[in-house]
Amino acid sequence: MADKWWGEQLLGRGDDGDLWAVSAAPVTRGELRAGVAGLRLRFRESGISEGSSVLLRMTPSFTYLQVLLALWSCGAQVVLVDFRLKPAEFEPLVERVRPQYLVVAAGAGGPVTGFRQESDFEVRRLAGGRPAEDGVVLVQFSSGSTGRPKVIGRPAGSVLAELDRHAGLPGTPGPGERVLLLNSVMHNMGLMTGVLHALAAGATLVVPPTFRPAEVLRLMARTEVSVMYGTPVHYDLLARTADRPERLSLRLAVSGGERVPEETRQRFLAAFGLPICQVYGVTEIGLIAGDLSGRCIPPEIGPPVPGVELEIDGEELLVRMDRSPYLYGEHTDRYRDGWLRTFDRVGRDPETGVLSILGRSDSLVVVGGLKVDLTEVEAALLDHPRVAEVVVTHQDAIEAFVGGDEDLTADELTAWCRERLSAVKIPKRFFVTRQLPRNSMGKLARDRALMHRHITSERSAQSRPAELKGAS
């Protein structure tokens, strides 16, 4: 690279012959650097330079990662958009950020069958696009689990500071280790915790070309994976797979994004002899807390990582930031006087400093003049042996959307809740389905209207009643 850029040390680490990543085939660090250099030249010829704004929407692949690094090396601000979004979801995002360029896969849209070694793309220049926001190199959208996604911008210093926090977390992957990544490379945990930390640490990234559990396990054995990152859904599927290799080199399994259900945690522990360790962060700043020792049990998430400054106001977690992460002057209520409101309620052990997630500050509702924590209702229902996942909402009444055994009845769920919750906390309506909808990050969707649309759609497909009336 002729010109210096903020991530040059990441890309420059290691010898050309060192293994960078493995999927269907291996890729060396020399091949990575050569690929980025060639793409950078192509982007320069297209007019992309310092201060350009580029929206990136491609098939998950090693090409995608090389494109991202090449755009950054040009000095561009990159807006990441999930390939799986439908046009009705994607087009409003383009209107909101108004990029100067699109880098998109040919025929973008539709299902993704897995991770590819290579993928084709095209570069389009858009009229009337606005240049990069001052200092911002990475733009992401919040998960949108509770409504309209937020537009979040991170400067280079924020990205590098998060990588430093990962490096300071005891037990984190180090040089020469093989790191399996099941999280999406389009989102923060997959990109930062997986791709960029492995690049910075000198570890080798392993990304399965298919997410069929038995094939993932064989890849883990063949490549001698010692660390894996995934979501609770991934861990549950792997733990249920009977066809497991006799010998695995796995020493660490890490999850983030949402709480690991106790049943999944126990099943994985029994199958692999390892606990699932938790890390916690938010898109606005990245990694905040974590424990890779396996000693913390949900709802514990571990102590704050070195380099992050926290306060707990009442029970709400606040994080110190130099600037608002929200672009275009939005969400002024979420950042004030140097502190970001996470809207997560936490407790802190006075002796160990370990944080525990208590719920969301916006999950507290008033029913009959009494405060009800909807996460407490969810926790009670999740203890039911035939319930796999739950979202509890409140508008005119408390409603529970339950994923699990479709033979569950309202009477059974109501009786279960009555043994564990006071009457005011018991849902008035239950909606039971085999599986609840999730957003593109794999998190449970928490939008009530979306849940009702899902139930209605499923009812139409199956011609069976969807609503089960519960406690009166």
From Swiss-Prot:
Reactions listed under catalytic activity: 3-hydroxy-4-methylanthranilate + ATP + H(+) = 3-hydroxy-4-methylanthranilyl-5'-AMP + diphosphate
EC number of the protein: 2.7.7.97
UniProt xrefs under PROSITE patterns: AMP_BINDING (PS00455)
Subcellular location(s) of the protein: Cytoplasm
Stored CDD domains: AFD_class_I
InterPro entries: AMP-bd_C, AMP-bd_C_sf, AMP-binding_CS, AMP-dep_synth/lig_dom, ANL_N_sf
Protein known as: 3-hydroxy-4-methylanthranilate adenylyltransferase
Organism this protein belongs to: Streptomyces anulatus
